[in-house]
Amino acid sequence: LWSGVAAKFLSYFKFLQYKHAHRILCWSPEVFMTSAAKGIPEGASAIIPRLFCRDVVAEIDFCINTFGAVERVRRPGPDQRAAHALLTIGPAMIMIEAEWPGLPSRPPTPDGSSPVVIYVYVEDVDKTVERAIAAGAKVLFPVQNQFWGDRIGWVMDPSGHVWTIATRIEETTEEERQARLSRIMAESKK
């Protein structure tokens, strides 16, 4: 069983071989097997979320239309449909992946339940949430100011991924945040 999973995993990376011209990534099975480890690739984020989706192109379009993401890499799967993409949103990276037999990750369930929420900072949360809605997102929590100094709104994209979209509107100290939270907690008990 595990040898079959490993073979599928390696075949998955065979079609994902890529060398990005902007020094982002250089991955292939051969690199993993024969090159010395370099830790974090030059130009890469230490943590890169991988969003598994039923429709990779729709998720790419959502990220571009909502966040102004830049598509850096797109690779087809065995069926020639888009199966992998690397996007950047500001300095952050995000990978969009198709479902792949044998891998332990799946897209969110149709009801949108997911153990992961992506928190993304933008220049204008209100306009970004409007763009998200225009791109097919559903508002989960409307945009409002928070005690820690962010203005945030929660949306679920058409693929079922949940995003907290935020703009920092006020710099606060930990003491200020604690005092505000204490007031909120006291008011909620009334």
Language model feature labels by segment:
Residues 159:
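C-terminal catalytic core of tyrosine-transesterase DNA break-rejoin enzymes
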Residues 53-57:
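Short acidic-aromatic low-complexity motifs
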Residues 1-10:
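Extreme N-terminal basic, low-complexity initiation segments
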Residues 8-9, 23, 71, 139:
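Short stretches within intrinsically disordered, low-complexity N-terminal or propeptide regions
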Residues 2-3, 17, 28, 96:
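Position-driven detector of the extreme protein N-terminus
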Residues 32-50, 60-61, 67-156, 165-190:
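Vicinal oxygen chelate
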Residues 12, 16-32:
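Short, Lys/Arg-enriched N-terminal segments with co-localized hydrophobic residues
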